[in-house]
């Protein structure tokens, strides 16, 4: 323990001034401790006073409204010429201490035997900060110390209380922690117990489950009635971790699925049968020969009298394949065509006949000609003989017929857009047509398909007459 003596003492100044400051040897006369104004108007402050020994004195002075002065209520001491200070001795400090249940020691100059109560001074910002720091230090120290070393813990508490006295606070104001308030456990005398006796909990082997107070909230130990029957208690397996990991992590090769043939059920279904006509159209040989003979005549027909001769357009030329061009005709065919051309010359002589013919031709070309609807004509012996003798010619005529049907449709679409010619133009066209027909067979070899058409219409007119 230190030899310093510490007492709490209350300094006061009567009411009147605005500001009072206490200074002395404790702060090297710097004037750092202001007095607190109470409700009565006077100024007071309670602070710990330290004395180095019994003969030591505590010197102090007041600064009232900025003036250094000495109080008449305290003892005065002349330090040097013209300088006075108030001072306190140990007797002055002991008289002010009032402790209930405490006894004084006469040999020690009236010092208290017990610890004096320490009244806290006025609250200040500096003291509050110090108190907070001290409380934190105290709690941290108490946590670190264990309960086994009781002597060390008691000494630390005494030191902390002394620190509280220095700052002007007491342990009464500070809320005590749980460890401070709880009493220490009394040490038990172990020597009284027998050396071989131990406290053992009773075990009930007949009970299926045992209940025990768990340590730190746990369920406690479990005693199994039949440990020999449980294989986990007896069997021990030695497993190589590497082999187990390799076996588990090994990826098995998955066989790729074989793609089988895809059957399209919806597409391959049988399409519904289309309704067929009861009497299918069958072309006889006689009808075919008749048509084959008439088709070259249709090709040789000149353009209509009342319509101008259409110029060949690139569309018409493209639509007609090369096979539709005039092929060299044998001598037998040329002689037959010349005979047919001579028979039709008499029909186209008069202008009246030509006009009537133009009207009839207009009616014919307004609708597509249908061969089946035309009245069947009796075949002559010459026509039947020609069909039997030249089967190759008939095949060529059929091909030409199919190709020229397309060219006819193109010509009709072009001629329908053009205007109808006047009467003068009709006469000119009739004269040109007559000149072309009277030409020699050699010079008109290139115009055979057009002249054949005139022969076809001429035959039709003869039959109707």
Swiss-Prot record:
One of its GO terms (biological process) is signal transduction. Residues 107-227, 247-276, 298-465 are annotated as: Disordered. Residues 166-177 have a biased composition (Low complexity). Residues 337-363, 385-398, 404-428 have a biased composition (Basic and acidic residues). One of its GO terms (molecular function) is protein kinase binding. Keywords: DNA-binding, Phosphoprotein. Residues 127-151, 451-465 have a biased composition (Basic residues). GO terms for cellular component: cytoplasm; nucleotide-activated protein kinase complex; nucleus. InterPro entries: AMPK1_CBM (IPR032640), CRP1_MDG1_kinase (IPR050827), Ig-like_fold (IPR013783), Ig_E-set (IPR014756). It comes from the Eukaryota. Cleaved in the vicinity of position 160 to give an X-DNA-binding N-terminal subpeptide and a non-DNA-binding C-terminal subpeptide. Residues 156-165 have a biased composition (Acidic residues). Residues 160-161 are annotated as: X-DNA-binding. The modification Phosphothreonine is found at residues 182, 295, 366. Belongs to the CRP1/MDG1 family. Cruciform DNA-binding protein which exerts an enhancing effect on the cleavage of cruciform DNA (X-DNA) by endonuclease VII from bacteriophage T4. This is Cruciform DNA-recognizing protein 1. It comes from Saccharomyces cerevisiae (strain Lalvin EC1118 / Prise de mousse). The gene is CRP1.
């Amino acid at each position: 323990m230190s030899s310093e003596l510490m007492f709490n003492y209350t300094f006061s100044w009567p009411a009147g001034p605005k500001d009072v400051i206490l200074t002395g040897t404790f702060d090297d006369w710097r004037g750092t401790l202001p007095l607190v104004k109470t409700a009565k108007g006077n100024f007071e402050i309670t602070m710990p006073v330290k004395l180095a020994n019994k003969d030591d004195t505590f010197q102090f002075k007041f600064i009232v409204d900025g003036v250094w002065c000495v109080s008449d209520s305290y003892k005065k001491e002349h330090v040097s010429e013209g300088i006075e200070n108030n001072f306190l001795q140990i007797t002055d400090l002991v008289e002010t201490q009032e402790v209930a249940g405490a006894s004084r020691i006469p040999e020690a100059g009236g010092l208290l035997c017990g610890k004096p109560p320490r009244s806290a001074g006025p609250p200040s910002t500096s003291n509050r900060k110090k108190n907070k720091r001290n409380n934190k230090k105290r709690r941290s120290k108490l946590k670190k110390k264990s309960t086994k070393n009781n002597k060390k813990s008691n000494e630390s508490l005494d030191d902390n209380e002394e620190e509280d006295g220095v700052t002007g606070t007491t342990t009464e104001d500070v809320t005590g922690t749980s460890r401070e308030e709880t009493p220490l456990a009394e040490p038990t005398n172990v020597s009284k117990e027998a050396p071989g006796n131990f406290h053992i909990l009773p075990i009930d082997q007949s009970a299926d489950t045992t209940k025990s107070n768990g340590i730190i909230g746990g369920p406690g130990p479990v005693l199994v009635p039949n440990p020999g029957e449980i294989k986990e208690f007896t069997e021990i397996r030695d497993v190589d971790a590497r082999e187990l990991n390799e076996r588990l992590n090994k990826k098995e090769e998955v066989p790729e699925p074989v793609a089988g043939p895809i059957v399209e059920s919806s597409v391959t279904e049988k399409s519904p049968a289309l309704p067929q006509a009861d009497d299918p159209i069958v072309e006889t040989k006689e009808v075919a020969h008749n048509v084959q003979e008439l088709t070259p005549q249709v090709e040789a027909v000149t353009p209509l009298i009342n319509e101008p001769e259409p110029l060949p357009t690139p569309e018409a030329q493209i639509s007609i394949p090369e096979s539709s061009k005039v092929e060299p005709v044998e001598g037998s065919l040329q002689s037959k065509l010349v005979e047919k051309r001579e028979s039709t010359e008499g029909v186209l002589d008069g202008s009246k006949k030509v006009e009537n013919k133009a009207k009839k031709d207009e009616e014919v070309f307004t609708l597509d000609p249908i061969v089946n609807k035309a009245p069947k004509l009796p075949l002559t012996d010459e026509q039947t003989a020609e069909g039997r003798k030249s089967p190759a010619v008939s095949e060529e005529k059929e091909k030409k017929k199919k190709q020229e049907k397309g060219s006819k449709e193109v010509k009709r679409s072009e001629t329908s857009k053009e205007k109808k010619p006047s009467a003068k133009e009709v006469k000119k066209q009739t004269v040109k047509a007559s000149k072309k027909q009277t030409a020699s067979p050699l010079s008109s070899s290139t115009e055979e398909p057009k002249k054949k058409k005139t022969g076809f219409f001429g035959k039709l007119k003869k039959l109707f007459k």
